[in-house]
């Protein structure tokens, strides 16, 4: 392999020192693509196809250089020429192929599949503009297309192409590959992204609006196009079928190339269905097998023995149910297969709760996945128990052997080595680098002799990361923050169940408290980051309230020195990699029973933040690992919450009437906030809290405030706080996605 200087000289006829950062980025892009192109693709008879609507892969340059073992050499070579790799990386645009935890998990998983040397590819779509780019203006979220596809990028066009049949036309796909290089491995996998050459951005008008009926020109423009109308729902079905038909044809082709006669397809392929978006892969595989002469019974049997389903949510709205008439309109050739699958279920089981097509003519995608797959997994211990005992109990009673738990994980290459190099290098220095491959070795930190030195170093690393975040926000958003304040951070997509609104009510509490003369021991900066779906009005209202409070506080000289609220614009993986290493208080405050797992909680823990959370998702497992004295838990537990829903016993108006709560909620429509905001939005959200509050914000609010105040007080005992930090970092090894993927392989995939 050429040195970087030789590569740059050949490309530009210049030295590194003579190149601009833009030229160096393109050189490094092609340098790392060349290095990964020289690695052979993983082989092995059986392969996992991880099909997902989202892959939130983040910027790839540094991640790939780390995995290829080139990072340190490249950094030194650039520095010797007076260049900074971090500044070069600024040129890179983040791929907009995902949005939330689902997509980030998929990205961590394909990284770990490659790192463990397993034969497995990600399969998805190549969205040209992703979800959207978030712009914060007039204290509201505005949306514009998130253009990330420049002329030179990480995609490699493949020669593969497939015909995808719809009711009235057939579309021809193009396959692009992104190499997935595992950490220090000799081989690689790929992320296979299907696209359409006919997609045309000129049809986008006014923000992210476009003609939803012009499928040939709109199909891969956006992730999760607005489905609040009929055309939007149909477009989602077009997208999902395009993804799974291409994926299914790829699976069959690759199996045949390796010697399969298709009767033995399950020996060659396993399909992991990541949430319900790829569910149509089941009838599509059956269709393709029967079209090749395999009889229906055998085709169903083959598909059942090669598909596995991961459930990521118990929210009814997220368990997709498509009207059969919509499927008839888009993919009529799948409808007879789905009807036959449903007929077989109804012939065997009389319980209407388990049917695929319900009495309203809606097709339940998760039900099809469970009946016609061989594995169903939840993504945290609590979540899996809720599936078995509550949400999917009817299915667990039928198929107990199918259900298993796979607690989510994160890749430590991205979230420690890349995001927090100072902490990573320090851990290497005192523990060795064994944790790079065996994350449990972080536990050695607990028994490290000189705790005082470790604490001093952790303090200085955290202070450095806070200054780094402050510079980043000043540069990118024009926001000045106090790096000597406590950093309290909540970053995740905007949803009522994640309860950003509860944190906003805490902000109001703290504002009023400071106004009353109760000055905190040190300043506090509360960060929010996340996007709200354009059709999700209440989520947009929550963003509006947060931004209004930010303005009210900034304009109040009695409060501004002590409290600041920052909404990070266009939150993404890049922003997360600045925020997470700088965090003191990690906000994981979903309503108990509603967050399947969460992975932000794991990233914060690994980087030395302490968790403020409910007993929900993976918070439960964090609490078990670190002990109750090293995590801050508040709120009702999942059993209580499930019981309140079952009995319709929660009345937000009763909680609103409480002395500690009413002034906070009323402040939403106070003159001070109304002066900064939109009356309609603020009044709508105020009424929502008092009259509905479906995710029980007011139920947990007083306990949340109490525990957060305790946390702020505890922060002042730096010695005791850092003891807790050390325990959290030490115990984070369990949450490596390498562990998760090893368990998927052992229990579900059975790859060599």
From Swiss-Prot:
Gene3D superfamilies: Glycogen Phosphorylase B. One of its GO terms (molecular function) is pyridoxal phosphate binding. It comes from the Bacteria. Transmembrane segments: none annotated. It is an enzyme of class 2 (transferase). The modification N6-(pyridoxal phosphate)lysine is found at residue 603. It catalyses: [(1->4)-alpha-D-glucosyl](n) + phosphate = [(1->4)-alpha-D-glucosyl](n-1) + alpha-D-glucose 1-phosphate. One of its GO terms (cellular component) is cytoplasm. One of its GO terms (biological process) is glycogen catabolic process. Its cofactor is pyridoxal 5'-phosphate. Keywords: Allosteric enzyme, Carbohydrate metabolism, Glycosyltransferase, Pyridoxal phosphate, Transferase. Its EC number is 2.4.1.1. InterPro entries: Glycg_phsphrylas, Glyco_trans_35, Pyridoxal_P_attach_site. The keyword Transferase applies. Pfam families: Phosphorylase (PF00343). NCBIfam families: P_ylase. Belongs to the glycogen phosphorylase family. Phosphorylase is an important allosteric enzyme in carbohydrate metabolism. Enzymes from different sources differ in their regulatory mechanisms and in their natural substrates. However, all known phosphorylases share catalytic and structural properties. This is Maltodextrin phosphorylase. It comes from Streptococcus pneumoniae serotype 4 (strain ATCC BAA-334 / TIGR4).
């Amino acid at each position: 392999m050429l040195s970087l200087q030789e590569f740059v000289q050949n490309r530009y006829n210049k030295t590194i020192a003579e190149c601009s950062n833009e030229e160096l980025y393109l050189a490094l892009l092609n340098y790392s693509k060349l290095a990964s192109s020289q690695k052979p693709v993983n082989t092995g008879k059986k392969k996992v196809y991880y099909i997902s609507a989202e892959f939130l892969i983040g910027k790839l340059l540094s991640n790939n250089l780390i995995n290829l073992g080139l990072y340190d050499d490249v950094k030194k070579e650039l520095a010797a020429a007076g260049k900074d790799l971090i500044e070069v990386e600024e040129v890179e645009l983040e791929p907009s192929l995902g949005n939330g935890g689902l997509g980030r998990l998929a990205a961590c998983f394909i990284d770990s599949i490659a790192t463990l040397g397993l034969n497995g590819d990600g399969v998805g779509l190549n969205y040209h503009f992703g979800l959207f780019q978030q712009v914060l203006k007039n204290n509201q979220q505005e949306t514009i297309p998130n253009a990330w596809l420049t002329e030179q990028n990480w995609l490699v066009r493949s020669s593969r192409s497939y015909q995808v049949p719809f009711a009235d036309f057939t579309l021809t796909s193009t396959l692009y590959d992104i190499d997935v290089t595992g950490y220090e491995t000799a081989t690689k996998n790929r992320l296979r992204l299907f696209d359409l050459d006919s997609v045309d951005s000129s049809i986008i008008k006014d923000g992210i609006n476009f003609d939803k009926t012009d499928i040939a020109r709109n199909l891969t423009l956006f992730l999760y196009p607005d489905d609040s109308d009929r055309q939007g729902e149909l477009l989602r079905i077009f997208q999902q079928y395009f993804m799974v038909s291409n994926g299914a044809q790829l699976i069959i082709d690759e199996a045949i190339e390796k010697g399969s006669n298709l009767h033995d397809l399950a020996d060659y392929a396993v399909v992991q269905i990541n949430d319900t978006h790829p569910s149509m892969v089941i009838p599509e595989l059956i269709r393709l097998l029967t079209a090749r002469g395999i009889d229906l019974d055998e085709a169903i049997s083959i598909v059942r023995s090669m598909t596995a389903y991961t459930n990521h949510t118990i929210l009814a709205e997220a368990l997709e149910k498509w009207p059969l008439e919509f499927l008839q309109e888009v993919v009529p050739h799948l409808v007879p297969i789905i009807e036959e699958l449903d007929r077989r279920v109804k012939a065997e089981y009389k319980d209407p709760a388990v049917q695929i097509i319900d009495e309203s003519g809606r097709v339940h995608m998760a039900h099809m996945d469970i009946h016609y797959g061989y594995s169903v997994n939840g993504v945290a211990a609590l979540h899996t128990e809720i599936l078995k005992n509550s949400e999917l109990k009817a299915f667990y009673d039928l198929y107990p052997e199918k259900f298993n738990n796979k607690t989510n994980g994160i890749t430590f290459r991205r979230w420690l080595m890349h995001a927090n190099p100072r902490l990573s290098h320090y851990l290497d220095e005192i523990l060795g680098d064994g944790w790079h491959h065996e994350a449990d070795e972080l536990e050695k930190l607990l028994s490290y002799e000189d705790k005082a030195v470790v604490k001093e170093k952790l303090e200085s690393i955290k202070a450095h990361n806070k200054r780094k975040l402050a510079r980043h926000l000043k540069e990118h958003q024009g926001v000045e923050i106090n790096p000597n304040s406590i950093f309290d951070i909540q970053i995740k997509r905007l949803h009522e169940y994640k309860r950003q609104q509860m944190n906003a009510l805490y902000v109001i509490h703290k504002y009023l408290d400071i106004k009353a003369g109760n000055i905190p021991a040190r300043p506090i900066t509360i960060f929010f980051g996340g996007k709200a779906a354009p059709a999700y009005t209440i989520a947009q209202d929550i963003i509006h309230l947060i931004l209004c409070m930010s303005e009210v506080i900034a304009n109040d000289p009695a409060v501004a020195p002590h409290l600041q609220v920052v909404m990070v614009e266009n939150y993404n993986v890049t922003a997360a990699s600045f925020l997470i290493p700088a965090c003191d208080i990690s906000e994981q405050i979903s309503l108990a029973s509603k967050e399947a797992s969460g992975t932000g909680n794991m990233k914060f823990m690994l980087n030395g933040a302490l968790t403020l959370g409910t007993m929900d998702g993976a918070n439960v497992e964090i609490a078990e690992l670190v002990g109750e004295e090293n995590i801050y838990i508040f709120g009702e537990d999942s059993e209580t919450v499930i019981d309140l829903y079952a009995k319709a016993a929660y009345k937000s108006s009763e909680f609103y009437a409480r002395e500690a709560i009413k002034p906070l909620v009323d402040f939403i429509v106070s003159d001070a906030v109304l002066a900064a905001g939109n009356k309609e939005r603020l009044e709508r959200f105020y009424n929502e809290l008092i009259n509905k509050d479906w995710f029980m914000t007011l139920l947990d609010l007083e306990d949340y405030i109490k525990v957060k105040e305790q946390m702020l007080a505890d922060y002042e005992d730096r010695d005791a706080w850092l003891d807790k930090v050390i325990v959290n970092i030490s115990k984070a090894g369990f949450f490596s996605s390498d562990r998760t993927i090893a368990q998927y392989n052992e229990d579900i995939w059975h790859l060599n």
